[in-house]
Amino acid sequence: MADLLAMSTNIIDGHAAPGELGPLNRINHQLSELGSELAVVEAFSHCIVFKTDDGLVTFDTSNEHGGKKCVGAIQSWTKDPFNTVVFTHGHIDHVGGCGAFCAAYEGRKPTIVGHENVAARFARYRMT
């Protein structure tokens, strides 16, 4: 697990140039805890996870190939079920992994939240 907060602080405070700390957009599917109730999984499009009393709230699900890896990383952190998946936008690299999140807990599917135009984008994906 990388100390993402320390890495970003070093860059913001001018102690290191971005390239000195290695790649900034790493695709390693590793979970880093940012707080006791907050984590990020580094993926093609990162997955942000919040623990709530109702279950996990996630922002984005990565792509189709990364979704299962993101779910696995999250389940190594907590066994809490997914309650809500929020799409920041409808690009396939942010929403393509949703199937893995929906299948993670048999009998319990998360609520999906996204902009009203996401449905039209999905229809276009199905056509192409």
List PLM regions with ranges.
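Acidic/polar short surface loop at catalytic or gating sites that assists cofactor/ion binding
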Residues: 2-15, 116-128
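Residue-level marker of intrinsically disordered, low-complexity segments enriched
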Residues: 9-10, 25, 38, 87, ...
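Blade/loop signatures of beta-propeller domains
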Residues: 9-30
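Conserved beta-strand hairpin/beta-sheet module of binuclear metal-dependent hydrolase folds
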Residues: 25-79
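Active-site metal-binding motif and surrounding structural segment of the metallo-beta-lactamase
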Residues: 31, 65-113
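Solvent-exposed loop/turn segments at secondary-structure junctions
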Residues: 45-46, 63-65, 90-94, 118-120
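Glycine-rich, histidine-containing beta strand-loop boundary motifs that form or position
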Residues: 52, 61, 86-89, 99, ...
